[in-house]
């Protein structure tokens, strides 16, 4: 009898031990989060992710960190329609993530009346004395970062956004578009004559303008502005001048983790979107890979700081990217030309800058050969030249002048595009850490706010 009871107790103990890992995972995801890190790949739909995954695995011989997060964490599919549109843009999409309410196009965290501010997750954590950060490779006054810390009726009012971000007291601000912090007399775009860099320094910010200055910056509030316009595409970036997104993310986490109350930070791969607007597949892939490195920095931080909710997603997909099969010479379904992608040295935008406003077909052929090792035909080069002359309008921001270049390069790169603007494609949402158990199934991007708010137990 005693032997039977002993064997039964051993069996029950063994069964209990089997469930400990599961209960541990449940406990981890149900704990209150001290920190929240959200990374947003602007314009990164499933095809942009897929192209980078293929390139990384087949050319670089390594997997994406996002793949690891997908496999070990939580995964959902995300939709993002807004109050007034099926297809969103970045201001509305970021505002929905930041506030949990459906937004209207181009307004930054404002109610549908265009006058009433809607409180953001960053404003809520600020009230709880958490540190805050915004990091992007686009402009720090661009729509995605702006939606978390500013309220304006139209996203184009970037001078007001810059002012509001500093008044908010965001502890870490890193990105481009320094022009909105400087008066016109100093080469900026501010019409009020104010120099916000000087004002930031007086308010206790360290101002950094290069990768080296960022590296040397002490712990404390920092305003890193690394380009008068957007930061460079990763494919064009000069490492000695501009930091990578991963380097900015690492510095941001070093600073923000000093807060005893925890922190909230949004880190954006902002130029994925711009490259996709231009149908520039090599630049898209390089910027997704740079974004993935920043995801890796965040994942490494989370391993050492498990009370951190990590979220990785996108605001929308851009341009209907597709990985087509037919090659120029055959009907075989060989897929994206990885060698052609690998040989591409600069962005389409930089190439167009080299050949100027009135290029000859010969000049276009020369620069494409130098930049991509691709020999355009005379007709293809003429198509690009004609389209450039016809559509280039320096007075207006548009993508049309690169459309013909992207079109003639499609059969060489074997990457297709449905448009040069946003789409309503569903997106990926990955997560790990406290509160991430709510990430599952099909979700609307307003629910990301709910996940973050619940994880931090905000009221």
Q: Which residues does each PLM region occupy?
A:
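Sec/Tat signal peptide C-region and signal peptidase I cleavage site
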Residues: 22-26
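Positively charged n-region of N-terminal signal peptides that target proteins for export
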Residues: 1-7
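Extracytoplasmic mature domains of secreted/periplasmic and thylakoid-lumen proteins
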Residues: 102-163, 169-170
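A glycine- and small-residue-enriched flexible loop/hinge segment at structural boundaries
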Residues: 85, 89-112
